[in-house]
Design a protein with these regions (language model features):
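Active-site histidine-anchored catalytic micro-motif
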Residues: 1-52, 174-188, 195, 199-210
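Core alpha/beta catalytic barrel or barrel-like domain that forms the active/cofactor pocket
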Residues: 12, 59-62, 105, 112-113
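Short hydrophobic/aromatic-rich motifs at helix boundaries and adjacent loops
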Residues: 17-21, 58-60, 132, 164
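Loop-rich catalytic cores of soluble enzymes, especially ATP-dependent carboxylate-amine ligases
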Residues: 33, 50-56, 67, 213-224
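Conserved anion/nucleotide-ligand pocket segment
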Residues: 42-45, 49-90
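Hard-cation-handling environments
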Residues: 72-224
Length: 224
């Protein structure tokens, strides 16, 4: 019995060769910030129905490029390089009725797994050659624009000093330690500089520290 497998996932997923081999179709969310998980689920369900009822034969190809970068210049809105690539890919999908789905993968860079990378997943109706050609083309475009994804960086000291110089509430985002991107979330670099340069500023700093949690659980309310 041949059972079709259709997968929907985050566009920041680590898509492996095994996942491509063991599924009929992989559809990623199209928006970052993530606004369309339910809509992507609907697209996946429709494709599954078409496979079962309309004899659609999905052929999928993923040309992966070894590009790892933060999400700073990778929103799918505005004029980021990733948004431009995504819009171009979606226009390609609209212009070719034989394309069932296109997805652009930007893998979370801190997952720390073998064979990480991103690129275009193309699914066609029984036309692997076209899927391969388009996937390779867009993955090459992605690689060729890699320098555009480099963000402006600040040291923790620079970020804190710049933040405290502004008379407003400030959000400092340490993207390299983002738990949602696969990092541990235990960096105290920003906290250290806040203590050094703004010890009396009211601040909230998130730090993953199970040992500190254990100590707190064993102390009464009001302890320091």
């Amino acid at each position: 019995l041949q059972i079709p497998i259709v997968v929907t996932l985050d566009l920041h997923a680590h898509v492996t060769e095994k996942m491509i081999k063991n599924s009929n179709a992989i559809l990623a969310w199209e928006q970052y910030p993530h606004l369309d998980p339910y809509e992507t689920g609907q697209r996946g369900a429709k494709l599954m129905r078409d496979i079962l009822e309309k004899n659609i034969k999905p052929k999928m190809f993923f040309s992966k490029t070894p590009l790892l970068h933060s999400a700073i210049n990778a929103s799918t809105f505005g004029n980021t390089p990733f948004a431009e690539l995504m819009r171009s890919l979606k226009q390609e999908e609209k212009s070719n009725p034989n394309i069932l789905s296109t997805s652009f993968i930007h893998v979370d860079p801190y997952i720390d797994q073998p064979d990480m990378g991103g690129g275009a997943i193309i699914i066609t109706n029984d036309d692997l050659k076209t899927a391969e050609k388009i996937s390779i083309d867009y993955s090459k475009q992605y690689w060729d624009r890699r320098i555009e994804f480099e963000p402006v960086l600040f040291s923790p000291k620079e970020a804190v000093l710049k933040g405290i110089s502004i008379d407003k509430n400030i959000l400092l985002v340490e993207t390299a330690d983002a738990c949602g991107g696969g990092a541990v979330g235990d960096s105290i670099q920003s906290l250290r500089e806040l203590i050094n340069f703004a010890p009396n500023k009211k601040s909230l700093v998130h730090v993953v520290d199970p040992f500190a949690v254990e100590i707190c659980l064993n102390k009464p309310l009001g302890s320091k």
